[in-house]
Amino acid sequence: VTSDPDRAATARMVVFPGQGSFGPITKEIVEGAMGAALRMVIERGDPFLGICLGMQLLFEHSDENGGHEGLKVLPGRVHRFPGDMPAVEGDPEGPKLKVPHVGWNDVTPTGEHFYFAHSYFVEPADPSLVMWWCRYGSVEFPATIARGNIFGCQFHPEKSQWSGLRFLRSFILGGRG
């Protein structure tokens, strides 16, 4: 665990958790020395796992906080869940789902349950980046993405009990989720 860009740049494997908001993190991480260190790890080919906001930061742009650029490692954008999504599909006049999306959801195709806590989701420009999907209301969004040594998950494996532990173990042992 480090906040030192020099230590991060020399790591053989990086797990980049994210908690908070895209705007303030952009200033601190993306535009700073840590952003350069993370890009270096990725370009070198070492395993990289972005969790929640850590995954979102891998992409080009987020609508959060008025719009900010990400690390631009992967093509795509980050969008907010609509605040008017019906809780029951096909019933636009009924109760609405709450944003943020907080709680347990299953992912496709594994069927395993993971814990999510987010208001924004990734829309990759390249759908082949997506390994697992999740649905919240009418929005199907990537639960996990992967390309080469880069891996990301929207859920919180550290809060996802056995499924999360298996996921992290798989990443640590194989450099992938």
Descriptions of predicted regions:
Residues V15, L49, Y115, M131, ...:
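Hydrophobic/aromatic beta-strand patches that form the interior of the parallel beta-sheet core
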Residues F22, G35, P100-W104, G164, ...:
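A general structural signal for well-ordered alpha-helical segments in protein cores
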Residues C52, H118, H156:
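Histidine-centered divalent metal-coordination motifs
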Residues V122-G177:
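C-terminal and late-domain segments of enzyme folds
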